[in-house]
């Protein structure tokens, strides 16, 4: 389990994150929401070890994150950044295969996992294509497959961090992507996903961390976190929140 206690982060004189406490339990999807500049991507950068906090602790499986060696950490923690770019004409299967580099499972097993991850990301039909020939949305799905392959099959002890994985996707693939993430968590992985779409978060996340200017406004179930009062305070928007008529999760409608 990835755990954060009393996290503070500053950039110069600007406090970006203030006293954040967070747990990513196995089998759950935690959504991080908030307006631009709320500290969402900065939080992910601390959680993956890219940035060191000014105060507080980040632990993975009870050990300080900084104590994990590179390959050992990579076998348990995978990160999909907001922008993933490659400047070389790799085939899609090679890009996804990069996720298997921390493992020593052999070429045959790796090929099976690459196929499974591409199918999970609805990108198997792209397997022989050049990465550089893909659209932005196709590239995003290929990189999702790469991080899924890195942790496949997503058992307990695996942690997946995703920064806006649906930002370039059409409505169909927004749902297929988050369905794949949901299935990964159902296998035992802990997942944190940064999203901007409130309704996608309400549908697919078990808990919501709602950030406001680097502070935790709410950390609760979608029903408890995504209230009209909270969304007015954080986003400045007036909304109607009602239960989805078929699925029961909160449905947010802008007034």
From Swiss-Prot:
GO terms for cellular component: plasma membrane. Coiled coil: none annotated. Gene3D superfamilies: P-loop containing nucleotide triphosphate hydrolases (3.40.50.300). Keywords: ATP-binding, Cell inner membrane, Cell membrane, Membrane, Nucleotide-binding, Translocase, Transport. It comes from the Bacteria. It is a peripheral membrane protein. It is an enzyme of class 7 (translocase). The keyword Zinc-finger does not apply. Residues 2-238 form the ABC transporter domain. GO terms for molecular function: ATP binding; ATP hydrolysis activity. Its EC number is 7.6.2.-. The keyword Zinc does not apply. It is found in: Cell inner membrane. ATP binds at residues 34-41. The complex is composed of two ATP-binding proteins (HmuV), two transmembrane proteins (HmuU) and a solute-binding protein (HmuT). Part of the ABC transporter complex HmuTUV involved in hemin import. Responsible for energy coupling to the transport system. Belongs to the ABC transporter superfamily. Heme (hemin) importer (TC 3.A.1.14.5) family. This is Hemin import ATP-binding protein HmuV. It comes from Pseudomonas putida (strain ATCC 47054 / DSM 6125 / CFBP 8728 / NCIMB 11950 / KT2440). The lineage of its organism: Bacteria, Pseudomonadati, Pseudomonadota, Gammaproteobacteria, Pseudomonadales. The gene is hmuV.
